[in-house]
Amino acid sequence: MAAVSLSVSTVKPLGDRVFIKVSESEEKTAGGILLPDTAKEKPQVGEVVQVGPGKRNDDGSRQAPEVGVGDKVLYSKYAGTDIKLGGDEFVLLTEKDILAIVN
């Protein structure tokens, strides 16, 4: 079996899935206290880096995704599959788990 080299450009989500680069979590509190890694909360904001072709409707047509590459999004806390690539954190989730586009 050949080894597969994964990178952001080689991951192509299927259906209505979205590949998101997770934003960095806060290093310190508003009061200036540094947080250890174990105390950091999982961020729920990230940037869309890849989008699938969309959900397939009952008639076979595709429903275009509402989000696009480059959108900053807020997503459900426990949604998706966490993936690490090249030291960065990503999450692969379905479009329905995206709560909002953040401007």
UniProtKB/Swiss-Prot annotation:
Single GO molecular function: unfolded protein binding
Annotated localization: Cytoplasm
InterPro entries referenced in this protein's UniProt entry, alphabetically: Chaperonin_GroES, Chaperonin_GroES_sf, Chaprnonin_Cpn10_CS, GroES-like_sf
GO biological process, one term: chaperone cofactor-dependent protein refolding
Keywords: Chaperone, Cytoplasm
An example Gene Ontology CC term for this record: cytoplasm
Family: Belongs to the GroES chaperonin family.
Function (record text): Together with the chaperonin GroEL, plays an essential role in assisting protein folding. The GroEL-GroES system forms a nano-cage that allows encapsulation of the non-native substrate proteins and provides a physical environment optimized to promote and accelerate protein folding. GroES binds to the apical surface of the GroEL ring, thereby capping the opening of the GroEL channel.
NCBIfam families: PRK00364.1-6, PRK00364.2-2, PRK00364.2-4, PRK00364.2-5
Quaternary structure (record): Heptamer of 7 subunits arranged in a ring. Interacts with the chaperonin GroEL.
Protein name: Co-chaperonin GroES
Source organism (scientific name): Parasynechococcus marenigrum (strain WH8102)
Lineage start: Bacteria, Bacillati, Cyanobacteriota, Cyanophyceae, Synechococcales
Gene: groES
